Amino acid sequence: MSSNVGLSTPRGSGTSGYVQRNYAFMKPRNAGYGAPYPPVSGANANDSSRGFKQRQPDKQILEHDRRRAVEVKVMEERERLEEENERIEQEGKGKGEGEGKVLSEEEIEERCEALRARLLKEMEEEENRKGDAADGERDEGRERRGWKRGPRDRERDLPPRERRQFKTYQVHELAEAKIEESERFKKALGIREDTETGEISSGRKDYEPRKRDRERY
């Protein structure tokens, strides 16, 4: 025992008698930055009457991740072109003349810029399609008045993309996917956007007393 800390004797304990830190213990992350949901304590404990509020993802972080994925693809294309140049040079040394043309650094840069521009344009179009899909409820109201759907509107009814397996640290991507899933679920059940949580059940509670009053008279 050292400084009145630890076991009085290490005999039979299988230890040295000193208190050590447990490095295998992992504290669950239920609060602080990056937590999926805020803790229910203090001021939040009295907010049980409020409706459920979905956590909104950070748009800047999501855009940064998408642009980073674009740069990764551009870098992979650059490495592929450079390896292709090395292969052509090796074949040219062995046979006297290569089958293909060796690209210069400027040509490689032009191809990479063209690929980057195309991927960024596709990313913007994907964001626009997501924004258009958010107006699905308004389109349904227009359909009831005889409005005909166009080819672009039919694209919104396509099945969602294959779900990705998110990592534990991808909280913003997971929140965005959860919001999209909730929107599809609301659209499938015909739930309006302005419907609050518990509104349907509270309306049923008001309906029961009125029904008993009518039966009594």
From Swiss-Prot:
Residues 62-122 form the CWF21 domain. The keyword Transcription does not apply. It comes from the Eukaryota. Keywords: Coiled coil, Cytoplasm, mRNA processing, mRNA splicing, Nucleus, Spliceosome. Residues 65-135 form a coiled coil. It is found in: Cytoplasm; Nucleus. Associates with the NTC complex (or PRP19-associated complex). The NTC complex associates with the spliceosome after the release of the U1 and U4 snRNAs and forms the CWC spliceosome subcomplex reminiscent of a late-stage spliceosome. Involved in pre-mRNA splicing. May function at or prior to the first catalytic step of splicing at the catalytic center of the spliceosome. May do so by stabilizing the catalytic center or the position of the RNA substrate. PANTHER family: SERINE/ARGININE REPETITIVE MATRIX 2, SERINE_ARGININE REPETITIVE MATRIX 2. Belongs to the CWC21 family. This is Pre-mRNA-splicing factor cwc21.
